[in-house]
Amino acid sequence: MKASMFLALAGLALLFVVCYASESEEKEFSNELLSSVLAVDDNSKGEERECLGFGKGCNPSSDQCCKSSNLVCSRKHRWCKYEIGK
């Protein structure tokens, strides 16, 4: 009786370890996949847009704000702001 209980508990412990290991592998795989997708997305954003976003510091003589997004470099405050009315 004691031996069968010991074997049953050992079997349950082994099952728990195997399930936990496979679950952690799945999580690691999904985390790696997600991070690789986000890394590719970040790289493509950097290649597409070489301009600054709203509220970023800029130099009025070399306007790096995105004209397509109606952003201009403020000469007074030296940061990218929306150009309203044009």
Swiss-Prot record:
The keyword Glycoprotein does not apply. It comes from Cyriopagopus hainanus. The keyword Protease does not apply. InterPro entries: Huwentoxin-1, Huwentoxin_CS1. It comes from the Eukaryota. One of its GO terms (cellular component) is host cell presynaptic membrane. Residues 22-49 form a propeptide. Keywords: Amidation, Disulfide bond, Ion channel impairing toxin, Knottin, Neurotoxin, Presynaptic neurotoxin, Secreted, Signal, Toxin, Voltage-gated sodium channel impairing toxin. Its main location: secreted. Expressed by the venom gland. Neurotoxin. Selectively blocks neuronal tetrodotoxin-sensitive voltage-gated sodium channels (Nav). Does not affect tetrodotoxin-resistant voltage-gated sodium channels or calcium channels. This is Mu-theraphotoxin-Hhn1d. Residues 1-21 form the signal peptide. It is found in: Secreted.
